[in-house]
């Protein structure tokens, strides 16, 4: 099980260093067009491959541009991670857009809309946070 802990530790370090590099290291203007958040990092068991999930605030066009910038910077990022983490061979880095936050916001919006509709029909008393007993 020590192998699993090592992979988790490396993933946490990659997340930390990548966050730092997104702020100070990557100079590509496309990357700085939207607010980029790292949501998750997955590292393969042999530490040779790394998938970084990012959430990007902005419209679809700016998200695509930021993703292009991140993919273009993946070689630089691989070199910096190898140097900073002092790994013999740095993992190949792939960025993937994480739409989980968008989906969550959409679901919350739908739930709020449903609650408003139920209040209008009188199914839920206005100002009540509790669901009616069935």
UniProtKB/Swiss-Prot annotation:
Stored Pfam families: RBFA (PF02033)
Cellular component per GO, a single term: cytosol
Location(s), subcellular: Cytoplasm
Gene3D superfamilies in the cross-refs: 3.30.300.20
One GO-annotated biological process of the protein: maturation of SSU-rRNA
UniProt KW keywords: Cytoplasm, Ribosome biogenesis
NCBIfam families assigned to the protein according to its UniProt record, in alphabetical order: rbfA (TIGR00082)
Family (UniProt): Belongs to the RbfA family.
Quaternary structure annotation from Swiss-Prot or TrEMBL: Monomer. Binds 30S ribosomal subunits, but not 50S ribosomal subunits or 70S ribosomes.
Protein's recorded name: Ribosome-binding factor A
Organism name: Parasynechococcus marenigrum (strain WH8102)
Higher taxonomy: Bacteria, Bacillati, Cyanobacteriota, Cyanophyceae, Synechococcales
């Amino acid at each position: 099980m020590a192998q699993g802990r090592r992979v988790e530790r490396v993933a946490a370090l990659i997340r930390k260093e990548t966050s730092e590099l997104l702020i100070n290291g990557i100079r590509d203007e496309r990357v700085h067009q939207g607010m980029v958040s790292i949501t998750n990092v997955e590292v393969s068991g042999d530490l040779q491959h790394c998938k970084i999930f990012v959430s990007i605030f902005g419209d679809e066009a700016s998200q695509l541009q930021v993703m292009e910038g991140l993919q273009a910077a993946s070689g630089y990022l691989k070199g910096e991670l190898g140097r900073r983490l002092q790994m013999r061979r740095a993992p190949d880095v792939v960025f993937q857009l994480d739409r989980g936050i968008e989906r969550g916001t959409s679901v919350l919006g739908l739930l709020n809309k449903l609650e408003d509709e139920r209040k209008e029909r009188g199914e839920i008393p206005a100002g009540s946070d509790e669901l009616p007993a069935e």
